[in-house]
Regions:
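Phosphate/nucleotide-binding beta-alpha loop and adjacent structural elements of enzyme active sites
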Residues: 1-216
Length: 216
């Protein structure tokens, strides 16, 4: 089943959906079309103006912030799905000014309703950002479609101090086995089956696919 079918299955009229890593709004518009009130997060100054142009007239709220454990602002090479920039023949991501926020604090400060559904596609930063979702796992318990970008442990491409590609649990990243403690299950859309809770929930190296995190 495609990810769009899952969006259609789990989005109910007037539900609240967050599109985290919204790019230029393709998914945000789909979520809106399925009946959700949509809040889109896209920090890249290359993408955000296009996101606003595509989405704000539809009633989608757009925020030019990225998520992290603590708030700060910086210049960093940033993975914005435009990897055509090269230095000395090596493809790199361009340096951009990025504003990081803590999601729980940002929600409170901006009076944003809590989500029923989250689409999370942030090019490996999910391995950090999911650590900040405990208030959601224990609270409103949204369904989360998370795109996982787990690179090999000996690979360092697109891995920047302020925008890491992937952080493994032993290095301080999110331990997906913690989902069991929050009474969440993981569904693999490629097979439409749940991962056995006796198995390791952490992705294998070179994993790049979506998973559904579903409260029991």
């Amino acid at each position: 089943m495609s990810e769009f079918n899952y969006y259609k299955q789990y989005i109910k009229p007037n539900s609240v959906a967050y599109d985290i890593g919204a790019h230029i709004g393709e998914i945000s518009i789909q979520l809106k079309n399925f009946g959700a009130d949509v809040y889109s997060f896209e920090p890249s100054p290359n993408n955000f103006p296009i996101l606003k142009s595509n989405c704000e007239s539809l009633g989608i709220k757009c925020f030019d912030v990225a998520l992290h454990q603590s708030p700060y602002e910086c210049f960093t090479r940033f993975k914005d799905c435009k990897t055509d920039y090269k230095e000395d023949g090596v493809t790199l991501d361009t340096v951009q000014y990025i504003k990081y926020v803590n999601l729980e604090d940002f929600i409170k400060e901006n009076n944003i309703p809590l989500p029923n559904f989250i689409k999370l596609d942030i090019e490996g930063m999910e391995s950090i950002v999911l650590k900040t979702f405990e208030f959601l796992f224990n609270g409103v318990r949204p369904i989360i479609y998370a795109e996982i970008h787990a690179q090999p442990k000996n690979m360092n491409n697109q891995n920047y101090p302020d925008n890491p590609h992937w952080v493994w649990p032993e290095d301080g990243g999110f331990d997906f086995n913690k989902l069991k403690d929050f009474n969440y299950s993981m569904l693999d859309p490629s097979t439409n089956t749940f991962i056995d809770k006796n198995f390791n929930y952490n992705p294998a190296e070179k994993t790049h696919q979506g998973f559904l995190l579903i409260p029991n």
